[in-house]
Structure formats: C-alpha cells, structure tokens
C-alpha cells in the first residue's frame, strides 16, 4: 500500500508540474487556483509520510525549505523571482518530500544555468532576460524519478 501511495504522489507531482510549467511558459504567470487545488493532496501525502511511513518531522519541514526560500527571494527581489515559482516548489515539497524536492530544485537550477550560459554565449539573451523556472523544475523532478 505504501508504494501505491508513493506512485500516486509521484503522478500527482508530475501532473502538477506539467500544468504549472505550461502556464509558466505560455502565460508567464501561474494561476493561484493550481497550487490551491494541489494543496490538499500535498497535505495528505505529507501526513501519510509522517503517520504511516514514520518520516521524521524535521524531514517534512526540510521539504518546505526550498519553496520558502524561493518565496523569500520573490519578496526581496522585486519580481526577479516569481511568487508562483515559490508556491509551486512548496507544493512539490508537500507532494514528494524533502529528497525529491531538493533534488528537483538543484537539478532545475543547474539546467537553467546551463541554458542561460549557452544563450549568453550566443548573445541571444542578456543579464536582464527572463526565463521560466518551472519547466526546469519539472525536468529536475523527472530526472529524480529516472534516477530513483
């Protein structure tokens, strides 16, 4: 049963990230309805890991740190980092847990950095160019699923 819940949580996270990435690419903003719709399943997954799998409370709190950090950056950076990126990372932390969330954020930032360096080298972008983060977060989560 535990593995079935894990697969359902992974599928929910993939669906969530796919829709959020599409909104981020095409609309350059995330509908507030999307994170709100996945908040309840995320809380269920978090409580399931705490109650049934014996996950440590500190690990569940650590799953929220990347999202909290991005929300803090969104508030401090005058829109350079979007609030939707932080909210979606918080929901990913609730759905997937600390390890997958931290891996996805790290891999997503690495992939985004590589693309930015490539575009800067080709002079297709400058330091003020805006890039959507959520497609790279989704790619980072898919990489986690492939390597897990």
Predicted regions: what is each one?
Residues 1-148:
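A membrane-topology feature that recognizes alpha-helical transmembrane segments
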